Regions:
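SDR active-site strand-loop-helix element
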Residues: 6, 31, 67-71, 108-113, ...
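NAD(P)-cofactor binding segment of oxidoreductase domains
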Residues: 67, 81-109
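Catalytic helix-loop patch of NAD(P)-dependent Rossmann-fold dehydrogenases
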Residues: 88-96, 116-139
Length: 139
């Protein structure tokens, strides 16, 4: 199974990538944005997620069966100070990945954040309606 981890050099991506590589049957390819990874145990692609042409190229070359989307601007303060850029990356980038997954018949696994909830209640469940109170949560 060909797995593409978009945002594979981030905190969750690094651990997920290692686990998948250790298991047989997974051909793992990952992307990074600003810092090239130090390990060379698999294929890496440089990707600025708002570069739709580059994203198209990666999908054509990798031909993933599964895409795990982890790329985002996740620092709340950075998002609040640069809302337009955060929307481009976190919303438009995700939309493009979703479109390409549909086009290439790849399953999409998208991880989100607890910031989609207001945070005043706690113990949220998967079927609770989102009610973000930050731009990061909205993106």
């Amino acid at each position: 199974m060909r797995v593409l981890i978009i945002g594979g050099s981030g905190f969750i991506g690094r651990y997920l990538r290692r686990q998948l590589i250790q298991k047989s049957g997974f051909d793992v390819t990952s992307t990074y944005d600003s810092r090239a990874p130090k390990d060379t145990d698999q294929s890496w692609y440089s990707l600025e997620i708002t570069d739709h042409h580059r994203l198209d190229q990666i999908f054509l070359e990798v031909r993933p069966n599964v895409v795990v989307l982890l790329a985002a601007i996740a620092d709340v303060k950075t998002v609040e100070m640069g809302q337009e850029r955060a929307t481009e990356v976190n919303v438009d980038g995700a939309r493009q990945v979703s479109r390409l997954c549909t086009q290439h018949h790849a399953r999409l696994i998208y991880l989100s954040s607890e910031y989609v909830f207001r945070g005043d209640r706690g113990n949220y469940q998967e079927d609770d309606p989102p009610d973000p109170n930050t731009h990061y949560g909205r993106t």
